[in-house]
């Protein structure tokens, strides 16, 4: 309300959902209020239903796919694919292309790819022996999205596109991530976090009503210890470092 009263541009918001409850009424509300909606969906039916069953332990892929196909005719929806050990086990030379073609067929045009971290189901976490296959998946994924840029209606990966734009603009950044710098997250309990990955780890930015208390986030982002990255030419272009992982396990120097 204060933004509209002062002719201030409304901020953008984002939510991540499994998509089960999305409909045109909700999407219309989100569209009018600058809320970007991202749907968690892990590629094809077999992979998605292996890890994302509904509350009744039933498969969800077909229902979500049907909703997304209808809604993307009128609204922009983003995808979020989370790589987990099921992707490692299912990998073949054609599998990465098949995962993204499945998403594209639903009407998605933009999204990102994450990696599972400290899952409640430890069987889904990646293991050291998975690294070789993970590298192949990353290679195939980058090849896929570069080829997509040459098509009439490409599917974009937000992170790959962001790095390319930084290169084209010669735009280097002091921060590896926007967590707590250009973005914040609010939980359903009203706790304010730098990003969703800080959830359930006792972190609260404690932003007051009259001023920004930023000492906490400064302690996280001002003391990066990614020593192995010091001599890398791409350190100010890279967006792979995660402040949340650092906060959760500083001694392991995870990045």
Locate predicted features.
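Canonical radical SAM enzyme core domain
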Residues: 1-50, 54-63, 81-98
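Cys/His-rich zinc-coordinating "finger/knuckle" motifs
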Residues: 184, 202, 236-239, 245, ...
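Short, acidic, Ser/Thr-enriched surface-loop or helix-capping motifs
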Residues: 187-189
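C-terminal accessory region of radical SAM enzymes
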Residues: 133-167, 192-240
């Amino acid at each position: 309300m204060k933004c509209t009263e002062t002719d201030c541009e409304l901020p953008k918001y984002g939510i991540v959902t499994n998509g089960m409850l999305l409909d045109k009424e909700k999407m219309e509300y989100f569209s009018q209020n600058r809320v970007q909606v991202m749907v968690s969906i892990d590629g094809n039916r077999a992979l998605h239903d292996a890890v994302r069953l509904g509350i009744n332990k039933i498969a969800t892929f077909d229902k979500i796919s049907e909703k997304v196909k209808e809604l993307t005719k009128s609204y922009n929806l983003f995808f979020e694919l989370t790589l987990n050990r099921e992707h490692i086990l299912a990998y073949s030379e054609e599998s990465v292309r098949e995962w993204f073609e499945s998403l594209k067929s639903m009407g998605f045009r933009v999204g990102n790819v994450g990696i599972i971290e400290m899952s409640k189901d430890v069987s889904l976490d990646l293991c050291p022996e998975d690294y070789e296959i993970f590298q192949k998946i990353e290679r195939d994924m980058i090849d896929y999205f570069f080829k997509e840029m040459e098509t009439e209606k490409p599917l974009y990966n937000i992170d790959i596109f962001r790095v390319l734009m930084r290169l084209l603009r010669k735009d280097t950044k002091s921060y590896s991530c926007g967590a707590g710098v250009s973005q914040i997250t609010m939980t359903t309990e009203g706790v304010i976090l730098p990003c969703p990955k800080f959830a359930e780890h006792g972190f609260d930015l404690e932003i007051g009503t009259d001023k920004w208390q930023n000492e906490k986030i400064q302690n996280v982002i001002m003391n990066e210890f990614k020593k192995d990255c010091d001599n890398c030419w791409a350190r100010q272009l890279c967006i792979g470092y995660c402040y949340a992982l650092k906060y959760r396990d500083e001694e392991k120097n995870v990045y």
